[in-house]
């Protein structure tokens, strides 16, 4: 399997995840803006990889598999960081717990959809769970919202 530009962009998105985590916890005033820049750069690779793959005829089963995995890794990690940012561990029933509940629902949905896609693929019905325009729109809104939420004034 040759390593194509779209696949390299997807792998770059995955590689940016630990960078995002490290920068998030840096005790510098610029780290909040750097987190947003890293997250936006990763989101841009999500837009670019598919567009490049389709326009250059470099689509592959591996790329089609890896792209949503990379999205889920990136979004799930960012949600966990947001829960860490907005949670107060001394108050179990504080309003901040809403962030943890929302993150759990979103991550649970992502895992469920991935499992459903895998199962449908195994039984030969993968066309029933292909990525739709609504799913792409959800990803755009989700990544935009997370990008805004990652920015914090210290």
Briefly describe each language-model feature range:
Residues 2-10, 14-16, 21-22, 34-40, ...:
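A feature for the membrane-embedded catalytic helix bundles of lipid/isoprenoid biosynthetic enzymes
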Residues 23, 27-31:
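Membrane-interface transmembrane helices that cradle and orient dolichyl/undecaprenyl
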Residues 3, 56-57:
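Membrane-helix interface residues
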Residues 60:
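Aspartate-rich (DDxxD/NDxxD/DxxxD) Mg2+/diphosphate-binding motifs
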